[in-house]
Amino acid sequence: MMEAVYPHTNEQDAARAFTGQSGIFDELYGTDTIIAYKRQRVRSHVLQLLAPGSNILELNCGTGEDALFFAGKGHHVHATDLSEGMLGQLERKVRMHGMDSVISFERCSYTDLPRLKEKGPYDLIFSNFAGLNCTGELDKVLASFSPLLKPAGIVTLVILPKFCLWETMLVFKGKFRTASRRFFSKSGRKARVEENYFKCWYYNPSYVIKNLKESFELIGVEGLCTVVPPSYIEGFAKKRPKTYNFLKNREDKLKYRWPWRFIGDYYIISLRNK
């Protein structure tokens, strides 16, 4: 298959950054307690919406942890990413676990999704952990979803909003830059992975709903790491296990409520194709 060639974009910058980190990505993040909590929350949300044997299109698949999980639950996953390094890690895992028949993958930009229509239609389009925050053209990306889905197909996205309560409170620790980085970010804010820089944009649930309202109906929004601290507050769960478990229980009760569903590090949003 001919490899797609993409012009230089911010998405390319992000892909280059994550390619540089791909070899150690799982080592860095695979054992983190709060990251494991986030994955469990997202996966539980998705599994409630999927019929057996669903056909999933995954965006920004990374090293393939979610692809392997959903394939292991009996679904077929077509995993995409623009990072060659991340796809290399996914390919290694697919071969190691003998999942060639249930996981396919290819390099694809968010803005090139329409060419995947012939490989669909899909029951679910899934994007985890803020991959879509790496594009300043989210409106165009969202506009490409409906033709890729079956009637009543689902979109589930995990996105960074414009306000995070925990992050804003870091101002009291003197971390002014981190505490304010989501503010005034209309033109994107600089992010760094290792020594590579790219821009990050923040989008509230209302933005997603507005851009999809013609073709989709909202299923629900839940806050993620809204009471539980973000995973970049290193060692929190290990240093304060009782507090962490208490906060987990509180988040489980509050994740669907206002304002908690809107003020987390992320939100999980699902919509159904009309």
What are these regions (language model features)?
Residues M2-A51, E65, F69, I154-S185:
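Conserved class I S-adenosyl-L-methionine
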Residues T63-D112:
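Class I SAM-dependent methyltransferase SAM/SAH-binding core
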Residues R115-I125:
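A short acidic, Gly/Pro-enriched loop at the edge of an enzyme's catalytic core
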Residues L124-E137:
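A short SAM/SAH-binding and catalytic strip from SAM-dependent methyltransferases
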Residues D139-I154:
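A short glycine-rich, Lys/Arg-flanked "PGG" loop and its adjoining helix->strand segment in the class I
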Residues N196-V221:
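Short alpha-helix
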Residues K210, G220-K274:
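A C-terminal cap/extension of S-adenosyl-L-methionine-dependent methyltransferases
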